[in-house]
Design a protein with these regions (language model features):
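Short, surface-exposed beta-edge/turn micro-motifs
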Residues: 1, 29-30, 49, 139-141
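Walker A/P-loop NTP-binding active-site region of P-loop NTPases
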Residues: 1-27
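Conserved P-loop NTPase motor cores
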Residues: 3-10, 36-126
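Short, solvent-exposed coil/turn linker segments
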Residues: 18-21, 89, 147
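Short glycine-rich substrate-engagement loop in P-loop NTPases that contacts/grips substrate
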Residues: 19-46
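A general structural signal for short secondary-structure junctions and capping/turn motifs
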Residues: 25, 96-98, 133-137
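Ordered hydrophobic segments in well-structured contexts
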Residues: 32, 104-106, 141-146
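Phosphate-binding and hydrolysis-coupling loops of NTP-dependent motor/remodeling domains
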Residues: 115-148
Length: 148
């Protein structure tokens, strides 16, 4: 598993590597990259055979690098990579990511994803069923994995 951490404040249990070392990461090992430069994000397409966690995924999508991230999303299956785009809100998930999403792991949320209505698969089911049920659950850490 390779975790891309925008600020180094999370994932401190993992060793830190440089972006040019990702091809050396063995499938049974985990590591993190901290705050890669926008020009380095394209290097993530060299990662193979593992899980790629994009923590605070909004950080990686700016106009300068969107094509690099898109290439990463498009080629993920050919490179045997599962991508986990982590966000603190549905509204923080860039629209591009929804196109490639197969599942949503949803915890309690306070935001209203109305502006993403056209982007989120199964929007009606999500807003009418899953969000209310999850938010009303007594366990603060309750979550649901929703196939998209």
């Amino acid at each position: 598993t390779l975790v891309v951490d925008p600020d180094g404040l999370e994932w401190s249990n993992l060793p830190t590597i440089d972006i040019d070392e990702i091809t050396l990461l063995k499938p049974d090992k985990s590591a993190r990259i901290i705050a890669p430069d926008y020009k380095d994000i394209i290097e993530l397409i060299n990662y193979r055979n593992g899980n790629l966690v994009l923590d605070d995924c909004r950080y990686y999508v700016r106009s300068r690098i969107e094509e690099g991230v898109r290439q990463l999303l498009v080629r993920r299956r050919q490179k045997d990579v599962d991508i986990f785009a982590v966000a603190h809100s549905l509204n923080e998930v860039p629209p591009t990511f929804w196109t490639f999403a197969t599942h949503l792991v949803l915890f309690k949320i306070k935001d209203n994803p109305q502006r993403l209505k056209q982007n989120i698969p199964k929007y009606k089911e999500l807003t009418e069923k899953h969000i209310p049920e999850i938010n009303n659950h007594e366990n603060h850490h309750y979550f649901r994995v929703i196939p998209l």
